[in-house]
């Protein structure tokens, strides 16, 4: 399976995907999607569009000069088939890919190394030039604290109300028991009275 590169953005064009344009001089141009095809027809420069690989390499955002990248170049030299050569080539391809990924990671880490310090210095300068930002921050912190206090108060009020409800329930249970006892006493008295009247 042959995977071609998009002529415009350099992303992979898989079989059955994308568009191929053949010019009058029989040169083939493959595009991964209509976006790239339209940009090519408008004669746009891929180095000036931030989403293309050409821009990223030109701007120094990706590894552009490395020995691992030379292996991907096409060589129009016919080679006689040799089973051992194919096996060693496949092993080498896997190893080269590993090395390339490691180097890309190292390149990215090296590129991002001083970003935290730069961000800190930029923020510091911004605060020094605009001291009112600190006051805004203080106001935000005060609001946060007020909100937290309100929440704590509401939670405590809920707990108190629950306790009061429990106490009320206990009191109501006691009252019901007392009423039942009174009713029992009244019933006993009535029975006694009825017995006396019968005699």
From Swiss-Prot:
<dbReference type="GO" id="GO:0005737">
    <property type="term" value="C:cytoplasm"/>
</dbReference>
<dbReference type="InterPro" id="IPR056366">
    <property type="entry name" value="Ribosomal_eL24"/>
</dbReference>
<dbReference type="InterPro" id="IPR000988">
    <property type="entry name" value="Ribosomal_eL24-rel_N"/>
</dbReference>
<dbReference type="GO" id="GO:0032781">
    <property type="term" value="P:positive regulation of ATP-dependent activity"/>
</dbReference>
<keyword id="KW-0539">Nucleus</keyword>
<dbReference type="InterPro" id="IPR011017">
    <property type="entry name" value="TRASH_dom"/>
</dbReference>
<dbReference type="GO" id="GO:0003735">
    <property type="term" value="F:structural constituent of ribosome"/>
</dbReference>
<feature type="compositionally biased region" description="Acidic residues">
    <location>
        <begin position="156"/>
        <end position="179"/>
    </location>
</feature>
<keyword id="KW-0690">Ribosome biogenesis</keyword>
<keyword id="KW-0597">Phosphoprotein</keyword>
<dbReference type="GO" id="GO:0030687">
    <property type="term" value="C:preribosome, large subunit precursor"/>
</dbReference>
<dbReference type="GO" id="GO:0051117">
    <property type="term" value="F:ATPase binding"/>
</dbReference>
<protein>
    <recommendedName>
        <fullName>Ribosome biogenesis protein RLP24</fullName>
    </recommendedName>
</protein>
<comment type="function">
    <text>Involved in the biogenesis of the 60S ribosomal subunit. Ensures the docking of NOG1 to pre-60S ribosomal particles. Activates and recruits ATPase AFG2 to cytoplasmic pre-60S ribosomal particles.</text>
</comment>
<comment type="similarity">
    <text>Belongs to the eukaryotic ribosomal protein eL24 family.</text>
</comment>
<comment type="subunit">
    <text>Associated with nucleolar and cytoplasmic pre-60S particles. At the end of biogenesis it dissociates from cytoplasmic pre-60S particles and is likely to be exchanged for its ribosomal homolog, RPL24. Interacts (via C-terminus) with AFG2 (hexameric form); the interaction is direct, recruits AFG2 to pre-60S ribosomal particles and promotes AFG2 ATPase activity and RLP24 release from pre-60S ribosomal particles. Interacts with NOG1; the interaction is direct.</text>
</comment>
<dbReference type="GO" id="GO:0005730">
    <property type="term" value="C:nucleolus"/>
</dbReference>
<feature type="region of interest" description="Disordered">
    <location>
        <begin position="147"/>
        <end position="182"/>
    </location>
</feature>
<dbReference type="Pfam" id="PF01246">
    <property type="entry name" value="Ribosomal_L24e"/>
</dbReference>
<dbReference type="GO" id="GO:0042273">
    <property type="term" value="P:ribosomal large subunit biogenesis"/>
</dbReference>
<dbReference type="GO" id="GO:1902626">
    <property type="term" value="P:assembly of large subunit precursor of preribosome"/>
</dbReference>
<keyword id="KW-0963">Cytoplasm</keyword>
<dbReference type="InterPro" id="IPR038630">
    <property type="entry name" value="L24e/L24_sf"/>
</dbReference>
<dbReference type="GO" id="GO:0001671">
    <property type="term" value="F:ATPase activator activity"/>
</dbReference>
<feature type="modified residue" description="Phosphoserine">
    <location>
        <position position="172"/>
    </location>
</feature>
């Amino acid at each position: 399976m042959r995977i071609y590169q998009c002529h415009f953005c350099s992303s992979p064009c898989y079989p059955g995907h994308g568009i191929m344009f053949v010019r009058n001089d029989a040169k083939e141009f493959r595009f991964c999607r209509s976006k790239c095809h339209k940009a090519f027809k408008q004669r746009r420069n891929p180095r000036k569009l931030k989403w293309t690989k050409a821009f990223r390499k030109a701007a120094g955002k990706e590894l552009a000069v490395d020995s691992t990248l030379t292996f991907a170049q096409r060589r129009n030299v016919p080679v006689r088939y040799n089973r051992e050569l194919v096996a060693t080539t496949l092993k080498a391809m896997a190893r080269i890919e590993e090395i390339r990924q490691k180097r890309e990671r190292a390149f990215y880490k090296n590129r991002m190394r001083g970003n935290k310090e730069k961000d800190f210095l930029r923020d510091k300068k911004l605060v020094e030039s605009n001291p009112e930002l600190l006051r805004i921050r203080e106001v935000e912190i005060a609001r946060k604290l007020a909100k937290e206090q309100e929440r704590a108060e509401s939670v405590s009020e809920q707990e108190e109300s629950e306790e009061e409800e429990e106490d009320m329930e206990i009191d109501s249970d006691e009252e019901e028991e007392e009423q039942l006892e009174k009713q029992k006493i009244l019933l006993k008295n009535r029975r006694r009275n009825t017995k006396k009247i019968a005699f």
